[in-house]
Amino acid sequence: MTYAAEDFDYEGLPIGSPMYAHLLAGAFSGILEHSVMYPVDAIKTRMQMLNGVSRSVSGNIVNSVIKISSTEGVYSLWRGISSVIMGAGPSHAIYFSVLEFFKSKINASPDRPLASALAGACAITISDAFMTPFDVIKQRMQLPSRKYKSALHCATTVFRNEGLGAFYISYPTCIAMSIPFTAIQVATYDTCMSFLNPNAVYDPTSHIISGGLSGAIASSLTTPLDVVKTLLQTRGSSSIPEVRKCKGSLDVVRFIYNYGGIPSFFKGIRPRMVVAMPATAVSWAAYEAGKEILIRVSKTSQA
């Protein structure tokens, strides 16, 4: 038995769908999102270091890719991706399943962007608790020092030298950044979808456009907090003594302001947006595609 696109509620899995359906769709989207633009994310991390590492890259993303590839090898742009893959799949599975749970509980919909934003904030708070240690390892691996042989070696070295707290020192900042980022992203996404896909039919183009726009807007507005997060997560590897002495977000904020004023809070904004637009578009499109596949499988099995 076949089904037309309009026979499926593309925006949601069937009522009563098992949690693993949301987990699988979320994991699929998370791995794709973080893998597609990983080299550009590595450039963004270096730009935000505010030391000699940041001078190894330029404001031009293409030139930075060419320079790093020629001096350090192409592989250096992908160092740490194993940590992202290990963390992104489960964390996005958690994020999307929690998002769908809260959206159903508070009746979030495209015409209620504030409810969607609240659901997104709840979801990211929980998923970031899982992802933050993996992000710390990723950013340490993205630096050119080569002091870590692998993601596992990085994790054990950081734990031995800096303790468990090093993996979570940036968590409050991550939440302070991720909640507005996700709230803006989800609200913008749902608002765009209400215009581009008002009938909620299977339309990947609308998911890609809405996802890209929501990612660009959310990433640009939250870049200052991302700079703070990067310095916190890499402080143990920083060549700047003042950074290594920072004990929390406020210390880092003061250092950044004294270092270069307001412009320093927007270091890496271009690569951050370049990463966020396609990554968010891929994330939403992959998640919605995963849901659509699971819906079809469910419908077929019930036929």
From Swiss-Prot:
Family annotation (Gene3D superfamilies): Mitochondrial carrier domain (1.50.40.10)
GO cellular component: mitochondrial inner membrane; mitochondrial membrane
Main location: mitochondrion
GO MF assignments: ferrous iron transmembrane transporter activity
Keywords for this protein: Membrane, Mitochondrion, Mitochondrion inner membrane, Repeat, Transmembrane, Transmembrane helix, Transport
Transmembrane feature ranges: 12-32, 81-101, 117-137, 174-194, 208-228, 265-286
Compartments it resides in: Mitochondrion inner membrane
Cited PROSITE patterns: SOLCAR
UniProt-listed GO biological process terms: iron import into the mitochondrion
Residue spans of the Solcar repeats: 17-105, 111-195, 206-293
Protein name according to UniProt: Uncharacterized mitochondrial carrier C8C9.12c
Source organism of this protein record: Schizosaccharomyces pombe (strain 972 / ATCC 24843)
